[in-house]
UniProtKB/Swiss-Prot annotation:
Lineage: Eukaryota, Metazoa, Chordata, Craniata, Vertebrata
Record family assignment: Belongs to the ligand-gated ion channel (TC 1.A.9) family. Acetylcholine receptor (TC 1.A.9.1) subfamily. Alpha-10/CHRNA10 sub-subfamily.
Superkingdom, taxonomy of origin: Eukaryota
Cystine bridges: 156-170, 220-221
Descriptive protein name: Neuronal acetylcholine receptor subunit alpha-10
Organism, scientific name: Gallus gallus (Chicken)
InterPro entries from the UniProt entry: Neur_chan_lig-bd, Neur_chan_lig-bd_sf, Neur_channel, Neuro-gated_channel_TM_sf, Neuro_actylchol_rec, Neurotrans-gated_channel_TM, Neurotransmitter_ion_chnl_CS, Nicotinic_acetylcholine_rcpt
Entry's transmembrane regions: 240-260, 270-290, 304-324, 431-451
């Protein structure tokens, strides 16, 4: 008999493979069912899977930070989305993979096997839900790996002393709730948490997530209890607070010294100070609402309080200076020390000059630089005639003229006195304006320096 052609042989082999493939898959399924039945025939998930009950079972933990959902500074609670991986060896669930068609691993519900009761010690969730019920990966050598996502709420001590330029350290402490260190040896797989799949947060920047293993002995028990603590290093993104809270405060605080530059007769000097004070009070309330009620005052809060104190002082000084400005003709003369210090030295230093005066020349002590001199007929006693042809017998007329001249002199003296007090007020306004400008500048530099 002649041999069959080569194409016919290839077609027959391909058809045979097509027919046998479903049969192989069905065989694998039957072997997997048989494996599952054989493994859990006499298995109890309530007992710790250790061949020697005197030895501790090694459990490794690795946490992956996926997202920071919320940081509640007022209640001091951090809400985060984590992927928690736990791995251990269950000697009761090992099999020979050659006896089961080469099956090396299976995925089964986590409720089928024993699981370590690893919980978040500093949990702040009222429901205390824990991890999701996900499958575990069981390998032929008995190693079990359990990956489960979890949304955790952990307590975090928030220090707002340098808000909005602050950084926080939030700890996530994982440990067994009932097993001590002689029964479960909990260790971290890596020295840091995994941040490769982290979704960036708009408010917080994650600087790192180091992991440390601690062994703690509590007062209730003599056995040691190991735990793994992940420290989440956070730094606040301050741009939002700079543009919405800090810069408006700086600009408003620079308005306070300008109140001294307003003319005293405008009637708006005190109104400006009170308006600025009310605006800062509103911003202070906005900061207080978002901060936890603690003893530590935030940096921006200190800046607000210092600015409000400065504006209060400037408003009080404005009222005092306005009282000097409007003292009127009946006021006493300017004291010599005030005339020398304010009208001479400070006025020249601050270039506060009246019309026709020069800031470089000192004023004369007698007149204080106010008004023209007495005309040449004043100061002559009534009754004396400057010329020989004076009609001295008109005593009544001369007496009246002398009286009018005296009233005019007293009126001019009162006017000069009031003008001097007005200039004193103007010099003090200019002096305090520069003093408060310097104070605002120094406070702003201090805030920026502390932030750096």
């Amino acid at each position: 008999m002649g041999s069959a052609p080569l194409p016919a042989c290839l077609l027959a082999l391909s058809l045979a493979g097509t027919v046998l493939a479903p049969g192989c898959g069905a065989a694998q399924g039957r072997l997997a069912h048989k494996l599952l039945h054989d493994l859990f025939a006499n298995y109890s998930s309530a007992l710790r899977p250790a061949e020697d009950t005197e030895r501790a079972l090694n459990v490794t933990l690795q946490v992956t930070l996926s997202q920071i959902i919320d940081m509640d500074e007022r209640n001091q609670v951090l809400t985060s989305y984590l992927w928690v991986r736990q791995a251990w060896l269950d000697a009761h669930l090992a099999w020979d993979k050659d006896a089961y068609g080469g099956i090396d691993s299976i995925r089964i519900p986590s409720s089928y096997v024993w699981r370590p009761d690893i919980v978040l010690y500093n949990n702040a969730d009222e429901r205390f839900g824990g991890s999701m019920e996900t499958n575990v990966v069981l390998r032929s050598d008995g190693h079990i790996m359990w990956d489960s996502p979890a949304i955790t709420k952990s307590s975090c001590k928030v220090d707002v002393s340098y808000f909005p330029f602050d950084g926080q350290q939030c700890r996530l402490t994982f440990g067994s709730w009932t097993y001590n260190g002689n029964q479960i040896d909990l260790r971290n797989l890596l020295d840091t948490g995994d941040l490769t799949d982290f979704v960036e947060n708009v408010e917080w920047e994650v600087l790192g997530m180091p992991a440390t293993r601690n062994v703690v002995t509590y007062g209730c028990c003599s056995e040691p209890y190991p735990d793994v603590t992940y420290t989440l290093l956070l730094r606040r993104r301050a741009s939002f607070y700079i543009f919405n809270l800090l810069l408006p405060c700086v600009m408003i605080s620079f308005l306070a010294p300008l109140g001294f530059y307003l003319p005293a007769d405008s009637g708006e000097k005190v109104s400006l100070g009170v308006t600025v004070l009310l605006a800062l009070t509103v911003f202070q309330l906005l900061v207080a609402e978002s901060m936890p009620p603690s003893e530590s005052v935030p940096l921006i809060g200190k800046y607000y309080i210092a600015t409000m104190t400065m504006i209060t002082a400037s408003t009080a000084l404005t009222i005092f200076i306005m009282n000097i400005h409007h003292c009127g003709p009946g006021a006493r003369p300017v004291p010599p020390w005030a005339r020398r210090l304010i009208l001479h030295h400070l006025a020249r230093a601050l270039c506060v000059c009246e019309v026709g005066e020069s800031c470089g020349r000192p004023q004369r002590e007698g007149t204080g630089g106010m008004g023209p001199r007495d005309p040449p007929g004043e100061g002559v006693e009534p009754g004396l005639c400057p010329r020989s042809r004076c009609l001295c017998h008109h005593h009544a007329v001369l007496s009246s003229v002398g009286y009018i001249a005296g009233v005019f002199r007293r009126h001019r003296t009162a006017q000069r006195r009031a003008a001097e007090w007005k200039k004193v007020a103007k010099v003090m306004d200019r002096f305090f304006m520069w003093v408060f400008f310097l104070m605002v500048f120094l406070m702003s530099v201090l805030v920026i320096g502390k932030a750096a």
